[in-house]
């Protein structure tokens, strides 16, 4: 059994159960001659059990025959950090003094466990440091150990 020839990849962040033919999904898939309605239906079915509106990074593989497959990744670390810190957006200032909220080290560890499949490490301590770095760049103070 031979594999299909890959035409290209499309990277999008799509809200759970919120795939519609509207931009950015429609134009991105239309350029590659992919059946937009079929993708939207398949994606919405695959994300049915998830909380509505969670941003999901998705990699769509488009094949030469215009068929497709897709892989849904875990939500961005910033989504989890904002949720744990109970804020709607990160700091707009570039200075480290602009703290907009706080998260605990335990929160960062929990987020790291959730994000483990998408991080480039298998070590939980390193993953936690990655999440703490994301928190700092968003203007969140990490308290605890």
Curated annotation (Swiss-Prot):
Would you kindly state one Gene Ontology biological process term found in this protein's UniProt entry?
translation
Give the record's GO CC terms. Answer: cytosolic large ribosomal subunit
Output the PTM entry: One or more lysine residues are methylated.
Q: Name one GO molecular function term.
A: large ribosomal subunit rRNA binding
Subunit structure, briefly? Part of the ribosomal stalk of the 50S ribosomal subunit. Interacts with L10 and the large rRNA to form the base of the stalk. L10 forms an elongated spine to which L12 dimers bind in a sequential fashion forming a multimeric L10(L12)X complex.
As for family, the record states: Belongs to the universal ribosomal protein uL11 family.
What is this protein's function per UniProt? Forms part of the ribosomal stalk which helps the ribosome interact with GTP-bound translation factors.
Q: What is this protein called?
A: Large ribosomal subunit protein uL11
Q: Which organism is it from?
A: Rickettsia massiliae (strain Mtu5)
